[in-house]
């Protein structure tokens, strides 16, 4: 079971003050424990790709992060650059304001800019930022992500307050159906929480506490 959980974890370091030694430690831990990926800011993608080149651990990065307020063209450029640098997965933040305006065309175009730029070369996870949304908006965001060709929907950036909840994971799983991934991120700090998210329908866990989760400990980190 521990190995199965490890293969569902995106081992994460997204704080703005993260330093090189922390990224090196992140990659080493990911190799040792067999995590699905390391999730890092774009400036670290090349280093992670080099450190993980002979492993099964993927490099994941973030697009339009953490606000989602960049233009679709900027997000598309970020995506292409990340893939060129070695990323195999990208976690993009939607245009949250457009979603709340019910401007579905703009939201879908924003997501599709990234899925088109990824062009099958990287998995695309769509961060909907659940803490800022009503249930209706969460469902709509999930539906638009699926329509635009995303591979996953994801709860949170970890930068807007709140994080993953079992209730939201269930809602998102119901909204996307069985064939799209659901990533729980934000506040998953121990094995019990991770298992609860998985039982609710999560297929990936984003956490800086990956080592604590697989060891059955509790970490202090929020993301």
UniProtKB/Swiss-Prot annotation:
Gene3D superfamilies registered for this protein in UniProt: Aldolase class I
UniProt main location, coarse: cytoplasm
Name of the coding gene: deoC1
Identification of the protein by name: Deoxyribose-phosphate aldolase 1
Chain's role: Catalyzes a reversible aldol reaction between acetaldehyde and D-glyceraldehyde 3-phosphate to generate 2-deoxy-D-ribose 5-phosphate.
GO molecular function: deoxyribose-phosphate aldolase activity
Listed pathway(s): Carbohydrate degradation; 2-deoxy-D-ribose 1-phosphate degradation; D-glyceraldehyde 3-phosphate and acetaldehyde from 2-deoxy-alpha-D-ribose 1-phosphate: step 2/2
Pfam families per record: DeoC
NCBIfam families the UniProt entry points to: deoC (TIGR00126)
GO aspect biological process, one term: deoxyribonucleotide catabolic process
Highest rank taxon of the organism: Bacteria
Reactions catalysed, as given in the entry: 2-deoxy-D-ribose 5-phosphate = D-glyceraldehyde 3-phosphate + acetaldehyde
Organism: Bacillus licheniformis (strain ATCC 14580 / DSM 13 / JCM 2505 / CCUG 7422 / NBRC 12200 / NCIMB 9375 / NCTC 10341 / NRRL NRS-1264 / Gibson 46)
């Amino acid at each position: 079971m521990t190995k199965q959980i490890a293969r569902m974890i995106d081992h994460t370091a997204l704080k703005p003050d993260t330093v090189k030694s922390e990224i090196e430690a992140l990659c080493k831990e990911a190799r040792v424990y067999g995590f699905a990926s390391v999730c890092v800011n774009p400036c670290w993608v090349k280093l992670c790709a080099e450190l993980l080149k002979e492993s099964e651990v993927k490099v994941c990065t973030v697009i339009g992060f953490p606000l989602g307020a960049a233009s679709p063209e900027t997000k598309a450029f970020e995506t292409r650059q990340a893939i060129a640098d070695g990323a195999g997965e990208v976690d993009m933040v939607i245009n949250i304001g457009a979603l709340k305006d019910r401007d579905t065309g703009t939201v879908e175009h924003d997501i599709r800019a990234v899925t088109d730029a990824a062009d099958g070369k990287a998995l695309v996870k769509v961060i909907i930022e659940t803490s800022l949304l009503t249930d209706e908006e969460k469902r709509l965001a999930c539906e638009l992500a699926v329509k635009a060709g995303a591979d996953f929907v994801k709860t949170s950036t970890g930068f807007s307050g709140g994080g993953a909840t079992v209730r939201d994971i269930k809602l998102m799983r119901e909204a996307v159906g069985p064939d799209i991934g659901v990533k729980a991120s934000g506040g998953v700090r121990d094995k019990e929480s991770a298992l609860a998210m998985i039982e609710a329908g999560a297929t990936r866990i984003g956490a800086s506490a990956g080592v604590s989760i697989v060891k059955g400990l509790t970490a202090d980190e929020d993301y």
